């Protein structure tokens, strides 16, 4: 199915377990993994689609295997206010294609789980299964720093919703479309 497409978007609001079950139901897990591994076409994950690319996730006392394309585990955020819903600033590295022309902007989030990092420095030292460096963008909500976006070769993903994030989100989507 995915061999005939120019690009793939895994969107969503919802639970990681449900999203992975739906992808398994259409025999899409291996296809997406191979697409990312080969790096021949741009792939974008949004919200739960972002979470799907990591190794594993725990939500509602259930541990689920993700696609395993990126190192990291999705966990419930340890903050007093959940879900994290609303606008927040993201902190991308200076040289990411995804954030070209975007600086100091706020994006719209709605989630309760994330890939939580100990420090922004450790988040920037990862390598994806496709062999490319993982360029991470971080955000802090109520003292909890988490990975809010990733660029790893042709794989890009955002915990936030660019489609709900006004002009900055539109620019981010234009940047991704330019990769096609």
Enumerate the predicted regions with their spans:
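A short, aliphatic-rich alpha-helical micro-motif
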Residues: 2-3
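Cysteine-nucleophile active-site neighborhood
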Residues: 7, 13-86
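Glycine-rich His-Gly loop
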Residues: 12-15, 48, 112, 160-162
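Amide-donor transfer/coupling interface in amidating biosynthetic enzymes
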Residues: 37, 71-180
